[in-house]
């Protein structure tokens, strides 16, 4: 009986389960403060599990990605689209930073009063702080959640191991798969954690806490739409000197629509390949560029990482300098490139960006947990942007005469 319940839950739709968790959390939060405090234990356990697995995930994910990927035999077109993917992701990240400056959002969180809200403001202090974090002991970086140190050692390890044997690389691939399975298990428990977090938030802050979540979601979605219709349109126009919107709407209709519901760039690869074939793009090109885009073209993820990191900074009262904003855009770009193929990958990389501002690790993980709450919509829009941009950039880099008459 009990095993059947577990199997039924494991096979259930995560979105539906999260929605049920949110609804029950609101009801409990309104009806009973005592029960909400008990339910909050589930939220604490969930955020603790995320805190435990996130450093190892970032380290293994980035190390394995650098160690195993080989672009040495890529042609000029592939090199061009790699550059375009990274540039597009950077512009999306920079756009998210600007959006947060114009429309800052503050979250209502417990324990913000005790958070570390001091951040270096002078350029020399910023670089000194960054350097000390970068050269941190790797074991200490993993245990303390120093994500800049983790990122540094992961990149260094990936480069150092790039020329090791295929058998050694397979070991890291297997370890990576094992860590991803643990992450998948933790994310599958999200409905319980979200239930506890929402119940406690409603009981402690009332509608004010939920309203801040809605504001954050609106900012995220609006920024992603701006990237879709303005940033991407400008990139296409400057690259082709043609009206970008016919191609953009084809990509939205035939790629973004499906990606919105699958919530997976990898799962949308066959859809994107079929669309590229209809557009008349060379198979030899899109056969490489589309799977590659599903791996490193993460404009939506960059938006999520940048906005949620700055929201965490706003919440604890940290003033962000222009230099820090620029560094955040770079960090969010490369962090987003490592977020592919991971359930909630962009959310789990938020502490990496938060470490730039000396934001308390507990506060960063509370923001991650809120990201899972709004992720019902955020993740769908993020994936739609990521996946449709794969086809968009593939089309303009292909140099083929495109077929716009697609039904």
Curated annotation (Swiss-Prot):
GO terms for biological process: serine transport; threonine transport. It comes from the Bacteria. It is found in: Cell inner membrane. GO terms for cellular component: plasma membrane. Signal peptide: none annotated. It catalyses: L-serine(in) + Na(+)(in) = L-serine(out) + Na(+)(out); L-threonine(in) + Na(+)(in) = L-threonine(out) + Na(+)(out). The chain crosses the membrane at residues 12-32, 42-62, 81-101, 141-161, 179-199, 218-238, 245-267, 288-308, 330-350. Its main location: membrane. Keywords: Amino-acid transport, Cell inner membrane, Cell membrane, Membrane, Symport, Transmembrane, Transmembrane helix, Transport. It holds the Pfam family SDF. GO terms for molecular function: neutral L-amino acid:sodium symporter activity. It is a multi-pass membrane protein. InterPro entries: Na-dicarboxylate_symporter (IPR001991), Na:dicarbo_symporter_sf (IPR036458), Ser_Thr_transp_SstT (IPR023025). Belongs to the dicarboxylate/amino acid:cation symporter (DAACS) (TC 2.A.23) family. Involved in the import of serine and threonine into the cell, with the concomitant import of sodium (symport system). HAMAP family: Ser_Thr_transp_SstT (MF_01582). This is Serine/threonine transporter SstT. It comes from Campylobacter jejuni subsp. jejuni serotype O:2 (strain ATCC 700819 / NCTC 11168).
